[in-house]
């Protein structure tokens, strides 16, 4: 055990020799001071080593008491005996210094165990008796200080144990506090996660509601356009019946132009609505995908415009040829169909009305299916867009463009089928009108 275990030290005492020469200093154990003995040097030692040394054999590493006691018969050999004792002590000190064993000269341990030193009791040495009494006093004070140091040591050990217990309690409290903080942080993190999920769900619901509103508006516009189309067809039908045969060509041409305009209007409306839905659902990806989307939209627009132009030219040529051929056929079969017109006129009107109604219903059904397909595709793409990375967005846009082209093709085919149906009905009406003309016009 270190010397610092016993608290602060005082200044070490010095020991003077008989001639006032060499001094013995005890820097490590301030209370281990001994009376001045001529030529004796004291080695430093701690109280624990003293106790251990006391429990060991008296003969190991110490001088016996009789080594320093003068014989009563040989008082004159006192100085020589002291010199021999000093030489032995010095030899033992030099030997025990290398072995780290404390050496107590003059047999102090044995003296403390037995309670007194056996000193020379010759009447000639009064100074020796005085030194013996002083030595006894020092030994008693040494024992008292040793006991006090042991008590201090026990007290310090108890304080250390109490401090260690307090440290363990504080450490446990600190760990509990950290665990509570970690639990609170985790709870806060979960709350933030739930809040974030709820906000994402609200945004998704808002997007779906906006899309449903757009779809309802598109349905209303589509119904109004279909209604307008029906009104225009009925008006054209009445005017075609009332007018002469040479007005049929102009009516067909005007109807064809109106159908093409309605087709273009529906395409533009569908394109605008889809663009608005895409803009609302891809606000977060607008910066990275805006340029690509604009390029694709421009290409799609140019392709659609070129396709519409080609289709208009082709349809114009086909309708012109069909009208010319039909006119020739009508002139050939005019005489044959004049007699059958009376019986088939009413039937033709019913068939035309049914055909128009069927065409309108088919148009509505196909429009609803196309809108549902577009909505389903848009919902699927919006859900994927919220989950997938930015690099997949380009592929989704390409797929959407292809789907849009397919829908445009379906719409175009549907319009062509309705136009074909209208032309067939108009052909029958023209044949009926030609059949009802008087013979003198012919």
Curated annotation (Swiss-Prot):
Q: Where is this region: Disordered?
A: 1-27, 48-79
Recorded GO cellular component terms are: cytosol; membrane; trans-Golgi network
Q: Where is this region: Homodimerization?
A: 211-414
Answer yes or no on keyword Coiled coil.
yes
Does the entry feature the keyword Calcium, yes or no? no
Coiled-coil region list = 127-213, 248-409
User: What keywords sit in the KW lines?
Assistant: Coiled coil, Golgi apparatus, Membrane, Phosphoprotein, Protein transport, Transport
Positions bearing Phosphoserine? 43, 46
Q: Which domain of life is it from?
A: Eukaryota
Q: Where is this region: GGA1-binding motif?
A: 1-16
Which GO annotations describe the biological process of this protein? Answer: Golgi to lysosome transport; protein transport
**Membrane topology, from the record:** Peripheral membrane protein
Where located?
Membrane; Golgi apparatus, trans-Golgi network membrane; Golgi apparatus, trans-Golgi network
Description of how the protein assembles with itself and partners: Homodimer. Interacts with GGA1, GGA2 and AP1G1.
State the function annotated in the UniProt record: Involved in the regulation of membrane traffic through the trans-Golgi network (TGN). Functions in close cooperation with the GGAs in the sorting of hydrolases to lysosomes.
What name has this protein been given in UniProt?
A: Coiled-coil domain-containing protein 91
Task: From the UniProt record, report the name of the gene that encodes this protein.
Answer: Ccdc91
């Amino acid at each position: 055990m270190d010397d610092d275990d016993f608290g602060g030290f005082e200044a070490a005492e010095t020991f003077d020799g008989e001639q006032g020469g060499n001094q013995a200093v005890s820097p490590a154990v301030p209370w281990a001071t001994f009376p001045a003995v001529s030529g004796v040097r004291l080695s430093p030692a701690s109280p624990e080593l003293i106790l251990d040394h006391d429990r060991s054999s008296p003969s190991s590493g110490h001088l016996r008491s009789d080594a320093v006691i003068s014989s009563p018969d040989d008082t004159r050999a006192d100085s020589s005996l002291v010199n021999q004792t000093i030489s032995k002590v010095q030899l033992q000190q030099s030997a025990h210094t290398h072995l780290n064993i404390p050496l107590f000269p003059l047999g102090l341990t044995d003296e403390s165990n037995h309670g007194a030193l056996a000193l020379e009791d010759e009447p000639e040495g009064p100074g020796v008796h005085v030194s013996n009494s002083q030595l006894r006093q020092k030994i008693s004070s040494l024992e008292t200080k040793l006991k006090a140091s042991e008590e201090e040591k026990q007290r310090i050990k108890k304080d250390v144990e109490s401090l260690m217990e307090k440290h363990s309690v504080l450490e446990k409290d600190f760990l509990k506090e950290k665990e509570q903080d970690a639990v609170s942080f985790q709870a806060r993190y979960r709350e933030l996660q739930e809040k974030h999920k709820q906000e994402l769900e609200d945004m998704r619901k808002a997007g779906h509601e906006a899309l449903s509103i757009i779809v309802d508006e598109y349905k209303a516009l589509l119904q109004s356009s279909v209604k307008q189309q029906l009104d225009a067809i009925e008006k054209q039908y009445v005017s075609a019946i009332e007018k002469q045969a040479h007005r049929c060509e102009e009516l067909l041409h005007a109807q064809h132009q109106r159908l093409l305009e309605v087709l273009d209007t529906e395409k533009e409306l569908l394109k605008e609505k889809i663009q608005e839905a895409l803009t609302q659902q891809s606000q977060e990806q607008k910066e990275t995908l805006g340029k690509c989307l604009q390029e694709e939209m421009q290409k799609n627009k140019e392709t659609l415009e070129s396709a519409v132009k080609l289709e208009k030219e082709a349809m114009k040529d086909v309708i012109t040829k069909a009208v010319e051929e039909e006119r020739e056929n009508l002139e050939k079969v005019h005489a044959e169909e004049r007699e059958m017109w009376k019986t088939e006129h009413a039937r033709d009107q019913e068939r035309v009305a049914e055909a128009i109604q069927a065409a309108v219903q088919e148009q509505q059904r196909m429009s609803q299916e196309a809108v549902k397909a577009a909505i389903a595709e848009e919902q699927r793409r919006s859900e994927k867009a919220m989950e997938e990375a930015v690099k997949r967005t380009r592929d989704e846009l390409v797929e959407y463009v292809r789907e849009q082209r397919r829908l445009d093709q379906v719409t175009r085919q549907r319009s062509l089928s309705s136009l074909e149906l209208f032309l067939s009905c108009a052909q029958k009406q023209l044949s009926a009108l030609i059949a009802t003309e008087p013979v003198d016009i012919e």
